[in-house]
């Protein structure tokens, strides 16, 4: 098991259409390439997961940042609670939430996301 960082993208057009029909909006979260993510750092080498800074830049501008200890639940609490409900296995991804600053990404945007001292990755929106 390990830790990384990723983007949990939402297609707002699909979300709005589903909401208007009173339907679940799973398709707005599960489209192709909807969850770009970094490589994983083995849990044994991850160190402190309480006070590290989580951040996102878009086109070189800082859009989101927060300390992991500002999250509603800690990483260990989320894993503990989910493991009561699901058999967590290698390959499962758990997205923890996001700091303030959520905004649309548009084709051509370049992003970089990371957790200080742990991992970072970059990509672009096609």
Language-model features, listed with the residues they occupy:
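Catalytic-core "active-site belt" of small-molecule-metabolizing enzymes
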Residues: 1-89, 93, 101-126
């Amino acid at each position: 098991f390990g830790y990384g960082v990723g983007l949990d993208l939402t297609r707002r057009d699909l979300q709005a259409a589903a909401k208007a029909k009173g339907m679940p909006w799973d398709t707005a979260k599960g489209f192709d390439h909807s969850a770009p993510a970094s490589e994983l750092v083995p849990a044994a080498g991850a160190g402190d997961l309480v006070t590290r800074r989580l951040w996102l830049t878009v086109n070189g501008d800082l859009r989101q940042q927060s300390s992991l200890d500002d999250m509603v639940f800690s990483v260990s609490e989320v894993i503990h609670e989910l493991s009561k409900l699901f058999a967590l296995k290698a390959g499962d991804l758990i997205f923890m939430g996001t700091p303030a600053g959520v905004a649309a990404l548009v084709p051509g945007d370049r992003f970089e996301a990371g957790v200080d001292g742990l991992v970072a990755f970059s990509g672009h929106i096609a």
